[in-house]
């Protein structure tokens, strides 16, 4: 890795994680020349209903399964920090990991509703944003209030890669074959998917803290 570790952040419910998340992450790694990607498995989304939401542990374990043998780290750091909103999480990460340069990864569906996020302009000022195409959402994303504000800060992936230091606000649009897989379709086809994952102690891949279980007391 370089002296500055370039890290993509992909946040979401991961309800469940699936191959589409992995494919987007691997594409961003190559297109932006990232060192690694962190998956921020959210304890809850203020803009989404809790109906049908699996436990945080089941969603985290599904993400671990999808991230195997790839430069992807799965983290529950939002739950550990106690942050509820993305803007607070990203500010904290920047302060906690000064040797890293972060870029926020999101699908076009998120950009279409980005103006509804708390302090969305502050998010854009905190770190660069890379938007990945998603089937059926490109038109809404292009017409969104957030795009109107960010349009003057757009740059190509090639120019972004070549920058010595990243700055914000910056918007990079990544184009590749859209992946049609969705967590909604997976839940519909297999509503009992969380039952595949057994409960127990895990260690967070970013903070290395124990999560989702009690440490056994020393003998």
Swiss-Prot record:
It is an enzyme of class 2 (transferase). It catalyses: nicotinate beta-D-ribonucleotide + ATP + H(+) = deamido-NAD(+) + diphosphate. GO terms for molecular function: ATP binding; nicotinate-nucleotide adenylyltransferase activity. Keywords: ATP-binding, NAD, Nucleotide-binding, Nucleotidyltransferase, Pyridine nucleotide biosynthesis, Transferase. CDD domains: NMNAT (cd02165). The keyword Cytoplasm does not apply. InterPro entries: Cyt_trans-like, NadD/NMNAT, Rossmann-like_a/b/a_fold. Transmembrane segments: none annotated. GO terms for biological process: NAD biosynthetic process. The keyword ATP-binding applies. Its EC number is 2.7.7.18. Pathway: Cofactor biosynthesis; NAD(+) biosynthesis; deamido-NAD(+) from nicotinate D-ribonucleotide: step 1/1. HAMAP family: NaMN_adenylyltr. Belongs to the NadD family. Catalyzes the reversible adenylation of nicotinate mononucleotide (NaMN) to nicotinic acid adenine dinucleotide (NaAD). This is Probable nicotinate-nucleotide adenylyltransferase. It comes from Erythrobacter litoralis (strain HTCC2594).
